Structures are given as C-alpha cells and as structure tokens.
Swiss-Prot record:
It comes from Mus musculus (Mouse). Gene3D superfamilies: 1.20.58.2190. Belongs to the SPATA2 family. InterPro entries: SPATA2_PUB-like. The modification Phosphoserine is found at S318, S326. The gene is Spata2l. Residues 204-223, 234-256, 269-300, 316-347 are annotated as: Disordered. The keyword Metal-binding does not apply. This is Spermatogenesis-associated protein 2-like protein.
Length: 426
C-alpha cells in the first residue's frame, strides 16, 4: 500500500468521524493496524510520508536517560501536531485555528519541552503557519487540503512509531540505553523481534554506557493557557475545547467540538476555563524521569546560597520523585520510606540515625554526580565503571538538573563530616 492510498484512507477516516460529530485525530483501528504493520516492516515509509521521523526522534530522544517516558512525551507531541493539522483541514472556517501562541499552553508544555524550536517551526510551516513575531504563529495562506492530510498522516505515523519503539524496549527489558543505538537497530530491522535481538547483542558487547549528551536550554514551565486564544479572556465563560463559549453562525454545532481522549484527561491544556492545568495521574507516576526532557532545571529554583533547610527540602522532595524499589532488593528501603520511618520514630521514640551517602572516587573535583545508588549509598558520574556492578540489582536514582545534583553532592560532603570525623559516633 503506497503513501497515496494511505492518505486517501486517512482522509476518509477523518471525514467519517466528522459526520459522527467528532473532529479529532484518527482512531480507526483497522487503519492503525495496517499502518503499524507497514511501519514495522519498512521504516523507510517515513521518508515517503515526508514526516522527518529521523530528525524528530533524534532530537526528541537526545540526552534522555530513560527512553520509555521520553517516547510517551513524543507521542503526546505528535498527537498535538496531528490535531492541529486536522483542525485546519476539517474546520478551515474557524479563525481561532489560524493563530498559535508560542509562549504558553500546549505549545510550551507538550511541544517545546521535547522538540527543538527549529523542528517545531518546520512542522508548523508544513501546515501553512508562519512566524508573525516572537509569540505567534499564524496561517496567512492556507495550504491545499491534500497537504494538510499528508501532514496529519505523517504525525499519525510518528505516533505509531513511538508505540513500536516502546514495544521494542518492553521486549528488551530495559529502556536505559543510548537513543542512537535504538534508532540504528530500528532502521536495520524488519520486525520487532529482530530489532530486540540486535540490541541484545549490541548491549552485551558494551561494558559501560557512554556518557549522556547534554540537553538543550530548558523551557520555561508556567501556567498553561489556550493554544490558540489570547491571554485576555473572560474566565467566567463556559469552558470548551477552544475557549469559545458559544460558536458563531459560521461555526459547526457544539456537538462537533471533539475532545480526543488525550485532552479529556487534561481538558484545560487547550481550553480556557480559567482553571490551572494538572497532569494526569499516570504522569505523576512517571515523575522519576524528566517529564518533558528539557524541563529539568525548572523543577527547582536555584538557591542563592547553600543552607541546610534547602538541602533537607530538596533531598526530601527527591525522595518523592525516586523510582520504586528494585524488586530484586526488597530489603533496601527507599529514601522516602526511610524518611517516613524516621519521622515516626522521632515522634514516639529515639530517632533512627539517617544513612550517610558518599561521593564515589569517579567524581573528580568540580564535577557533579548524575546517578545515586540507594543500595551502596554512593554518588556516581555517568561514565563510572562501578555502575556495571550496581545496575543488575541495585536501586539507581537519576539526579535531575544541576540544582539537585549540587545538593546531593553537598549532602555527601556533610555526611562525610558528620559520620567520618572523630567523635561523630558514641
């Protein structure tokens, strides 16, 4: 099946859903299954669809320690891009779809956190958007309808590619590996099984992981507003998908305002009901990895000076973000559980002496740790050779951003003074 045939099937799917009162991304299970199978067998279909798959995945996965949540973030971004193209194709008379705010809303929280500004601009240019100023993208001349369908189909294929890569990681049994290795294996394989086998052989040859490349400049994380609408909007108006309380005469009926499943979970991401956006519960479960990749530095404000209060607050918060315990080490309690036990014992009995952490010898002066082993209670650099002994059974924690890394290093230095100095123990 060629790309032209896929485009026609995709167009019919969109128009069929519109007749049913839904104007959203494609959810046809048969088309989904067909496209999945074609993509698994032939990665080069992305080239025929002209969806810039290799550039987008290379950019979106670059520098991510754990690729599983990174792929979920990319899938959300591709769904939002697909929805923008579908809106222009199905509802070209809706003027609010001709302007996208680039300083807030879904653009910041879903797109800019995982993809570079250059690739986002290129993706929106395919839909006819041009940059009007530093805060807006606008459609001045709508592109042909067939081009919008092609762009939306490409984003649909990118979403499925995220699922294919996630399936590879699931069968591989790990999602902590270099992104370039995953993409190289995917392009060289004709099915999921051969891709997994290629990666298993490759990982068996590597004694230590290469250092992670740095992420780009973090995006500002602020309160989201509507992707299309202005900031000056009546908060008491009825909330809708696009911030319009009552459609005009040239707008479709209210029942056509489709909310795709993703946005039903966070309806205020695009709409403007005056309520703050809150991430879904599953996003909180994935908080141990950077939620949008480039937002690491914004998770905590930079302290003006070191203090034990900021150290304690940061370490307690990092315990909340810690991944669950390793099933192979049930006797090792997580820092969060240790803190709860310490609080309980201090209220009803003698306080339990907190565990001390040490900086491993791999950390040269001036370098910050990137990983923390809660089993050995040591801080490591990414390239540390001792990590090969920790990875199979120990509980490893990824330290998010320079602020958290600096505070953990300061904790290790304080622990060294408290527990290793003469007279520290009775």
């Amino acid at each position: 099946m060629g790309s032209s045939s896929l485009s026609e099937d995709y167009r019919q799917c969109l128009e069929r859903e519109l007749r049913r009162g839904r104007a959203g991304v494609c959810g046809d299970p048969s088309l989904r299954a067909v496209l999945w199978q074609i993509l698994v067998e032939d990665f080069d279909l992305h080239g025929a669809l002209q969806d810039d798959a290799l550039a987008l995945f290379t950019d979106g996965l670059w520098g991510r320690a754990d690729l599983a949540p990174a792929l979920q973030d990319l899938a959300r971004a591709f769904e939002l891009l697909e929805l923008a193209a579908v809106h222009l194709y199905l509802l070209p008379w809706r003027k609010e779809f001709t302007t996208i705010k680039t300083f807030s809303g879904g653009y910041v929280h879903v797109l800019k956190g995982v993809l570079s500004e250059e690739l986002l601009t290129r993706s929106f240019q395919k839909m006819g958007y041009v940059r009007r100023d530093n805060h807006r993208l606008m459609v001045t001349t709508p592109p042909p309808a067939c081009q919008l369908v092609q762009v939306a189909l490409g984003c649909f294929a990118l979403r499925l590619e995220c699922e294919i890569l996630s399936e590879v990681l699931t069968q591989l049994g790990t999602s902590v590996l270099p992104a370039e290795e995953l993409l190289r294996a995917r392009r060289a394989s004709g099915d999921v099984a051969s891709c997994v086998a290629w990666l298993q052989q490759r990982l068996a040859q590597d004694e230590e992981p290469p250092p992670l490349p740095p992420r780009g400049t973090p995006a500002t994380y602020g309160a989201p507003v509507d992707l299309y609408q202005d900031l000056q909007e009546d908060e008491s108006s009825e909330a809708s998908l696009y911030g319009e309380p009552s459609p005009g005469l040239d707008s479709p009926p209210v029942e056509l305002a489709y909310r795709p499943p993703l946005w039903e979970q966070s309806a205020k991401l695009w709409g403007s009901g005056g309520q703050p956006w809150e991430p879904p519960a599953d996003d909180m479960h994935r908080a141990s990895s950077p939620p949008y990749g480039a937002l690491e530095e914004e998770l905590e404000p930079e302290p003006s000076a070191f203090s034990f209060l900021s150290l304690r607050r940061e370490l307690s918060r990092s315990g909340d973000l810690a991944p669950p315990e390793s099933p192979s080490s049930p006797g090792q309690a997580s820092p969060r559980h240790r803190q709860a036990e310490a609080a309980a014992s201090s209220a009803y009995g003698p306080a339990v002496e907190p565990l001390s952490y040490q900086a491993h010898s791999c950390l040269s002066p001036g370098n910050l740790p990137t990983l923390c082993c809660d089993t050995c209670r040591q801080l490591h650099a990414t390239h540390c050779t001792a990590l090969s002994a920790c990875r199979p059974t120990h509980s490893l924690r990824i330290l998010l951003g320079d602020n958290q890394r600096r505070l953990w290093l300061q904790r290790a230095q304080v622990d060294n003074l408290l527990y290793d100095s003469p007279g520290a123990h009775p």
